[in-house]
């Protein structure tokens, strides 16, 4: 999936820059945003192949961003990053995969490759189509 465009959204600039460097070294084109509103703007204006999204951000958290993205372009896969192990089930249902912050670059790359390699309409990591009703 090299050459794919990934949108990374995280209010922590250092983590964002590290993920950007890891992804670019692996051949991805990376767009970054430090807040949900900017991320949604980039999402709307660009062709995006996948999203790597932080859960805990001020003003607009990752759940609200994922919900807006699903309404507009439900086919775009979303990975949710969090330092929290227990995320609300309604948020987890909106995304294709979750990744615990602090996991290494290899885990990020493996989950991203798997996520963007899925074809439209395939089930998410929990066996349900992302954004579907439970």
What are these regions (language model features)?
Residues 94-116:
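Output/docking surface of receiver
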Residues 3-14, 19-23, 51:
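Conserved acidic segment of CheY-like receiver
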Residues 35-38, 61-65:
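Acidic catalytic/metal-coordinating carboxylates
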Residues 32-50:
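Acidic, metal-coordinating helix/loop segments flanking the phosphotransfer/catalytic sites
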């Amino acid at each position: 999936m090299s050459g794919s465009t990934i949108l990374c959204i995280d209010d922590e600039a250092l983590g964002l820059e590290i993920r950007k460097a890891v992804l670019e070294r692996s051949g991805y084109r990376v767009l970054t945003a430090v807040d949900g509103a900017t991320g949604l703007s980039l999402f709307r204006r660009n062709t995006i192949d996948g999203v790597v999204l932080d859960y805990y951000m001020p003003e607009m958290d990752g759940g609200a961003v994922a919900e807006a993205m699903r309404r507009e372009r439900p086919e775009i896969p979303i990975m949710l990053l969090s330092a929290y192990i227990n995320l609300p089930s309604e948020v987890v249902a909106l995304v294709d995969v979750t990744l615990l912050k602090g996991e290494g670059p290899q885990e990020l790359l493996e989950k991203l490759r798997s996520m963007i390699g899925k074809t439209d309409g395939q089930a998410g990591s929990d066996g349900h189509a992302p954004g579907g009703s439970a």
